[in-house]
Amino acid sequence: MHDESEKRETSLKLFSTKEAYSSILDKSFSVPTAEGRILDHGFTKEEIPYIYMLPFKILKEPKLIMFQVKIIHNILPTQSSLFRARITDTDVCPLCNLESQSLKHMLITCSVSSSFWIFFSNWWHEKFNQKQTLSESTISYGWHKESNNWEVLNYSLIVAKYNVFATSVPNGVLDFDSFLLRLNNKIDFLCTIAFRSNRLSEFKKTWAKLL
């Protein structure tokens, strides 16, 4: 009886968050409206599981994982949703102070956010000598084409989106330097994890151009 209990405990420890989410997807518990929006952005049904699994595959921090999951399912709090819930007095975007702040507005169509993504594209070209088109689908759901820098690009995009979100919450000023500082802190965190798991050489190979 004791051995059986230990086996069950070990089995539970090995059942990761990633596997749990995969199990949910296998049982078709995904939000239908999320799937519809993904298809509207030009992805195929076969690509949808990759979009759902992206944050679990490349991220280590639970906060960032849940952040991207909320974007996928369009449940990330915005001024618009908070206003509808009567939590805030206005739905106006704190970044541009011009329009209602939906998720799409906050991350993509806001004039301040649009300028931020131009800086991101220029920075990426400078670091990797690659011209990266940041379409609405790429910003929202990630880059899913084969690329040597696939992991770095998607990780950087999620941190960049989080920086936009975090800046808009306290009515702050969105600047690119704050993103770079946040990204460098995250890279240091990933480096520590890689060192502790004896995968430092692999980490340095992946992130070489940003170290």
State the predicted function of each range:
Residues 1-37, 206-210:
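Short linear motifs embedded in intrinsically disordered, charge-biased segments
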